[in-house]
Amino acid sequence: MGQKVNPIGLRLGINRNWASRWFPNYQTAPLNISEDHKIRKFLKKELYYAGVSEIIIERTAKKLRVTVVAARPGIIIGKKGADIEKLKEALKKIVDKEISINIKEVKRPQANAQLAAENVTMQLERRVAFRRAMKKVMQAAMKAGAKGIKIKVSGRLAGAEMARTEWYMEGRVPLHTLRAKIDYGFAEAMTTYGIIGAKVWIFKGEVLQKGIQPEKKEEAPARDKEGRGTRRRGRQ
């Protein structure tokens, strides 16, 4: 089950919190969900070059607070906060409430799964070889302190006629362990051959109660797998 399900959704209430935080009722829930989707879609498009990893939306009766977690917060804020005011005016067209926007910086962007997935897709759009792009992102994440990382890409890789899936893994990524802090990200690359999807899982350690010592396990060596049957790749 841990291999198939979204690792963030599986750990909600255990070591992850919700990205939308409000108390719904049967009348307002559909509208709130629709507005949250529109806000996220707008901000991801508008702040693409700021490296947005997460958007947290909190609601009260009359107020809406949006927290944007990004790798380059200066691009969002602008000169003397001018760009923040423009964002507020744009969001008021979507939501008829008093809006406040908070900006948080990602401490280690190389070890953030969403930013890592977007990094892979940006390289693929620049026609970088997919294996090179994956290994480069993996090395950067491990240097930034990740305990393990797994990257999977799917689509017409290297312009092949038949779509396939390939993945690389380094270190430990225990998807079945609920106390494991697993970060997950997904992005798509629009290439001339079609869309290539990239998924990234990053293991950042275990969340334990006080007084409990984690089990010591040896790290697995880096490995890769082609996702079509048992056919092996030829010499590169």
Swiss-Prot record:
<dbReference type="InterPro" id="IPR005704">
    <property type="entry name" value="Ribosomal_uS3_bac-typ"/>
</dbReference>
<dbReference type="InterPro" id="IPR004087">
    <property type="entry name" value="KH_dom"/>
</dbReference>
<dbReference type="InterPro" id="IPR036419">
    <property type="entry name" value="Ribosomal_S3_C_sf"/>
</dbReference>
<dbReference type="InterPro" id="IPR004044">
    <property type="entry name" value="KH_dom_type_2"/>
</dbReference>
<dbReference type="GO" id="GO:0022627">
    <property type="term" value="C:cytosolic small ribosomal subunit"/>
</dbReference>
<feature type="compositionally biased region" description="Basic and acidic residues">
    <location>
        <begin position="213"/>
        <end position="229"/>
    </location>
</feature>
<feature type="region of interest" description="Disordered">
    <location>
        <begin position="213"/>
        <end position="236"/>
    </location>
</feature>
<dbReference type="GO" id="GO:0003735">
    <property type="term" value="F:structural constituent of ribosome"/>
</dbReference>
<feature type="domain" description="KH type-2">
    <location>
        <begin position="39"/>
        <end position="107"/>
    </location>
</feature>
<dbReference type="GO" id="GO:0006412">
    <property type="term" value="P:translation"/>
</dbReference>
<dbReference type="InterPro" id="IPR001351">
    <property type="entry name" value="Ribosomal_uS3_C"/>
</dbReference>
<dbReference type="InterPro" id="IPR009019">
    <property type="entry name" value="KH_sf_prok-type"/>
</dbReference>
<comment type="similarity">
    <text>Belongs to the universal ribosomal protein uS3 family.</text>
</comment>
<protein>
    <recommendedName>
        <fullName>Small ribosomal subunit protein uS3</fullName>
    </recommendedName>
</protein>
<dbReference type="InterPro" id="IPR015946">
    <property type="entry name" value="KH_dom-like_a/b"/>
</dbReference>
<comment type="function">
    <text>Binds the lower part of the 30S subunit head. Binds mRNA in the 70S ribosome, positioning it for translation.</text>
</comment>
<dbReference type="Pfam" id="PF07650">
    <property type="entry name" value="KH_2"/>
</dbReference>
<keyword id="KW-0694">RNA-binding</keyword>
<dbReference type="GO" id="GO:0019843">
    <property type="term" value="F:rRNA binding"/>
</dbReference>
<dbReference type="InterPro" id="IPR018280">
    <property type="entry name" value="Ribosomal_uS3_CS"/>
</dbReference>
<dbReference type="GO" id="GO:0003729">
    <property type="term" value="F:mRNA binding"/>
</dbReference>
<dbReference type="Pfam" id="PF00189">
    <property type="entry name" value="Ribosomal_S3_C"/>
</dbReference>
<keyword id="KW-0699">rRNA-binding</keyword>
<keyword id="KW-0687">Ribonucleoprotein</keyword>
<keyword id="KW-0689">Ribosomal protein</keyword>
<comment type="subunit">
    <text>Part of the 30S ribosomal subunit. Forms a tight complex with proteins S10 and S14.</text>
</comment>
